[in-house]
A protein has these predicted regions:
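N-terminal helical cap/lid subdomain that shapes the substrate entry/recognition surface
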Residues: 1-77, 89
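Asp-based, Mg2+/Mn2+-dependent phosphohydrolase catalytic module
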Residues: 2-5, 53-59, 80-85, 91-197
Length: 197
C-alpha cells in the first residue's frame, strides 16, 4: 500500500512537473477532461517515482477520487473568519479559479459556498486565469464593476497579471513570504485583508 511516507519525498518533483505543464500550456484548466487528465498524470508520475509503476493507474484514480472529497482538505485557520467578516461588511464575494467542474461541490462540502455570490471555474467557462475574460465573467455575474473590485489570489502570474489585465486591483496572499517582489499588494494572512480594504 502507498503511504504518505512513500510519496512525500517526491512531492517537490510532482510540483515541478505541474509547474512545467502549466507554463508549457495551462489550457488543460479550460475543460473538465483536461484538468482531470493533468491530475491523473501527476499522480501516475509520483507513483513511478515511488516505485509502484505496476499499479500507477489504479492508485492515480483512487487519489483523484479522494482529492475531490472535503475530508481530504483543510482550510487555513483564518479563512472562515475572514469570509464572514467581509460578508458582514457587505462585500460581494466570488471565486475565480483554475479548477475542474467539481469546485462548487467541494466548496459546498467544505461549508464555504454560502459565503460566495458566484463561483467561476475555468473548466466550466472555458477560460483560465490569467485570461481577463474569466475575471470579467465573475464581475458580470456579481453585478460589480472591475475597477471597484479586488481579486485576492496566491499566484502573481495567474492572479495578479490576470486581475490587472481585467482592470481589477490585485492582492497576493503570500503566506510563506516568498513573493516580496511580485509587483502587487501582498498580505501574509487572509485576515490582513480586513485592514487593507
Amino acid at each position: 500500500d502507498l503511504t504518505v511516507r512513500d510519496v512525500e519525498p517526491h512531492m517537490p518533483a510532482m510540483d515541478a512537473y505541474y509547474e512545467a505543464e502549466y507554463l508549457r500550456d495551462g489550457d488543460f484548466w479550460c475543460s473538465h477532461e483536461g484538468s482531470t487528465a493533468i491530475w491523473l498524470d501527476q499522480y501516475r508520475y509520483v507513483c513511478h517515482l515511488a516505485g509502484i509503476g505496476h499499479d500507477a493507474e489504479g492508485v492515480a484514480q483512487t487519489v483523484h477520487e479522494a482529492y475531490r472529497r472535503a475530508e481530504c482538505w483543510e482550510t487555513y485557520a483564518d479563512v472562515t473568519a475572514c469570509l464572514r467578516a467581509l460578508k458582514e461588511r457587505g462585500y460581494a464575494l466570488g471565486v475565480v479559479s483554475n479548477w475542474d467542474a467539481g469546485l462548487e461541490g467541494l466548496l459546498r462540502d467544505l461549508r464555504l459556498l454560502p459565503y460566495f455570490d458566484t463561483v467561476v471555474s475555468s473548466a466550466v467557462v472555458g477560460y483560465r486565469k490569467p485570461n481577463p475574460v474569466i475575471f470579467n465573467l465573475a464581475c458580470e455575474q456579481m453585478g460589480v464593476r472591475a475597477e471597484s473590485s479586488v481579486h485576492v489570489g496566491d499566484r502573481p502570474d495567474a492572479d495578479g497579471d490576470g486581475a490587472a489585465a481585467a482592470g481589477i486591483r490585485a492582492v497576493i496572499v503570500d503566506r510563506h513570504d516568498a513573493e516580496k517582489d511580485c509587483g502587487y499588494e501582498r498580505v501574509t494572512a487572509l485576515t490582513d485583508l480586513l485592514e487593507l480594504l
